[in-house]
Amino acid sequence: FWIDLRLPLHDNDTPAQCWAQFRVSLPAWSNETQHELIETLQLAPHLDKRLNMLSTGSRRKVGLVAALASGATVTLLDQPFVSLDQPSIRSLQAFLAQQGQNTDRAWLIADYEEPAHLPLVSVIQL
């Protein structure tokens, strides 16, 4: 799974339209995860707004919902905490910590430093 919502391709789409497009091509998509993350990442007030109307942090949250709900076997999260508010960072950390017990999916986090409060199986320094 790959997405970069900074690209202008999705500027005129709402979050719901983006997720509907991804859901079609992702058979393991989790509606339950999508709805849980909409709540915990506080995206409900933004569901009818076009992406080009959202802040950088809210736009990143839309992409994170897609990545986390995708059901992809391997998901790379490139600097997932950038531009997020503290409650969203804590929610994302809690979600990833919970998913760490799931052996059906692998999560790769690329970042400049190890995320605090998130147990990691392995760390590769480049």
Regions found by a protein language model. Give the residues of each.
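ABC ATPase nucleotide-binding domain signature region
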Residues: 1-24, 115-116
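Conserved ABC ATPase "signature" region
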Residues: 32-46
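Conserved ABC ATPase signature
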Residues: 50-59
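Hydrophobic anchor residue at the start of the ABC signature
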Residues: 64
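Hydrophobic residue in the Walker B motif beta-strand
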Residues: 73-75
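ABC-family nucleotide-binding domains
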Residues: 78, 84-89
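Conserved catalytic loops of ABC-family nucleotide-binding domains
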Residues: 87, 95-117
